[in-house]
């Protein structure tokens, strides 16, 4: 409460902590861990509703990575026949979809923004759910446009060149502005 509420442009809500990546420039995986932990969906939605009552219409989902389970994560767990891990990942993914379904039911004047990895562009189901949930923008990490640069920052999972451009276009095609 340092400033009167009407001086704030937007509010923020954190829905998940931790990130399974280990990018060299990022402290999150060291400070918050590599195992994503989600807040309860109902608690998150209630916080958003409370913020709306206070007059906020733009909310940043201040997660370090709004897409903590990739399709590749699911595929690897399945191939390894790691049933426990596969169950955990599917549950985490289901919670993400549940959250987005509930956000989609909020009044249409609510708009959200988040941070996400490029891998989400490979998941049209997830991008569609984001669009329906009024997530209008995403900060997508593009730390380098070369393979060598990505390797240097431990982001070999990201893309470069035409592949990078194609993935960024996927976000746009689903109504999500990339920053």
Label each PLM-derived region with a short phrase.
Residues 1-178:
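Radical SAM [4Fe-4S] cluster-binding motif and immediate context
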């Amino acid at each position: 409460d340092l400033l009167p509420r009407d001086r704030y442009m937007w509010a923020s809500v954190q829905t998940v902590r931790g990130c399974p990546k280990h990018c060299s420039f990022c402290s999150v995986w060291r400070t918050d861990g590599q195992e994503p932990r989600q807040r309860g969906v109902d608690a998150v939605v209630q916080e958003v509703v409370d913020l709306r009552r206070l007059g906020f219409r733009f909310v940043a989902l201040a997660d370090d990575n709004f897409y903590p389970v990739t399709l590749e994560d699911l595929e690897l767990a399945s191939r390894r026949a790691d049933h426990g891990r596969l169950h955990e990942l599917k549950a985490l993914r289901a919670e993400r979809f549940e959250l987005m379904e509930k956000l989609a039911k909020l009044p249409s004047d609510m708009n959200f923004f988040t941070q996400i990895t490029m891998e989400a562009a490979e998941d049209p189901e997830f991008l569609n759910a984001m669009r329906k949930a009024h997530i209008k923008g995403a900060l997508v990490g593009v730390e380098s446009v070369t393979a060598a640069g990505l390797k240097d920052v431990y982001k070999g999972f990201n893309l470069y060149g035409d592949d990078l451009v194609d993935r960024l276009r996927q976000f746009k095609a689903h109504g999500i502005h990339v920053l």
